[in-house]
Amino acid sequence: MEYNNNNQQSFWQFSDQLRVQTPNLANLSLNDSIWSTNSVFKERRNLDIAATTDKNNNQIDYYQKKTTSDNINSNWNWKSSGSNNDMGLGFGPVGSKSTVDLNPIDKFNSPFNDTWKFNSVNVNVNGYSPSSAVNGDFNKGVYTSMKKYGYNVNLKNNNKNKGIDEDHQIQKGGKKNRKNQQNNNNQRNEDDKNNGLDKRFKTLPPAEALPRNETIGGYIFVCNNDTMEENLKRQLFGLPPRYRDSVRAITPGLPLFLYNYSTHQLHGIYEAASFGGTNIELNAFEDKKCPGESRFPAQVRAITRKVCLPLEEDSFRPILHHYDGPKFRLELSVPEVLSLLDIFADQNP
C-alpha cells in the first residue's frame, strides 16, 4: 500500500514540475491538459487509436507527424515502445505497461499510451476482438462504444425483428393485443347474435323494409290480372314466402292497398281484418306444380273500406320509397299512407 502511494505521489510531483518548468506547457490551463477532452486544443485527437494505429505497428502517433528530438517538446508526440506481453502492476488500469522501473518521463508517457493500446493484446473471445471494438475518440472521453450483439438479428435478411424484445424474444404489447383480440371476438359474437335476430324477425333486405324505429302505417300487396279476382273474392291478400316475417307487423284496421303490376295501377282503399300471418288459407293461390301449397303464403284477411278509382303510377309513385330502379317498398310509413289517402280522396269526391 505504501509502495503504491509513493508511486502515485512521485507521478503527481513530476506532473506539477512538468507543467511549471516546461516552457511550452507552462501556460496550459487545467482544461487544456492532456487528460482533458476539451476541443479547444485543435491539433490533438483524443485517443484516436483506431484511426492511427497500424496492425503491424504497435506505435501510436497522435499527430501523424515524424517525431524528432527537435520537436518533441512542441508536438508532444506520445509513443509507446513497450512489449506486447508486458503485463505489470504499473500505474493505470489492468493490462497497462508496468511503470515500476521506469524513469519519470517514461512513467508519465507509459500509462497514457499503454493503458488504451488494446491492439497489442491479441485476444479473441466469441468473435470479439478488443482492438476492433475500441472507438478511437473514446466516445468523446466517456466510454468506448463496444459492438452491439443483436440477440434477435435476422442474418439472412439483415433485419431485426420489429416489436420484439432483443434480450428475451418477447412480443411487445402482448396485453394490448390480447385485449384487442378479445374485443374483436366479443364484437363478432354480438354481430352474429344480431344477425340471428334479423333472420328470425325480418327476411327482407334493409332497402325493402322500414327502419326498425319507424312505425308501419300501411301495406301494399301485389297482384296481376290472374290473381286479382281471387284476392277480392276470398278477401285475402297474399305475397311470396320472403314476406312472411314482414306481414306479421300487420294488425287489424291497418290501411291496405293492392297494386296490379299488369296494369300498373294502385287499387284501394282496403283494411286489414286480421293479423298478418302464414298460410291463413292453405289452398289459396295454390301452386299448380306443388299441389296443396300456396304460391303466396304471406297472407292477411282484408275488407273493402272504400271503393275508389285506381291511381295511375304518375300520381302515386312520387310518394313511395323506391329502390333498385322502378321497385318500391311495400311497407308504408305513416306519412306515405296519409299522402295516398289524400290522393284517393281528391280523385274520388
Curated annotation (Swiss-Prot):
PROSITE patterns: DCD. Residues 214-346 form the DCD domain. Residues 157-201 are annotated as: Disordered. Induction: Induced by touch and salt stress. Induced by wounding, calcium, magnesium and methyl jasmonate. Induced by osmotic stress, cycloheximide and ozone. Induced by abscisic acid (ABA). It comes from Arabidopsis thaliana (Mouse-ear cress). Pfam families: Dev_Cell_Death. This is DCD domain-containing protein NRP. PANTHER family: DCD DOMAIN-CONTAINING PROTEIN NRP (PTHR46034:SF37), PTHR46034. Disruption phenotype: Reduced length of primary root and increased sensitivity to salt stress. Contributes to the initial phase of responses to abiotic and biotic stress signals. Binds FYPP3 and facilitates FYPP3 degradation to promote abscisic acid (ABA) response. It comes from the Eukaryota. Residues 188-201 have a biased composition (Basic and acidic residues). Keywords: Cytoplasm, Stress response. The keyword Cytoplasm applies. One of its GO terms (cellular component) is cytoplasm. The keyword Transport does not apply. One of its GO terms (biological process) is cellular response to hypoxia.
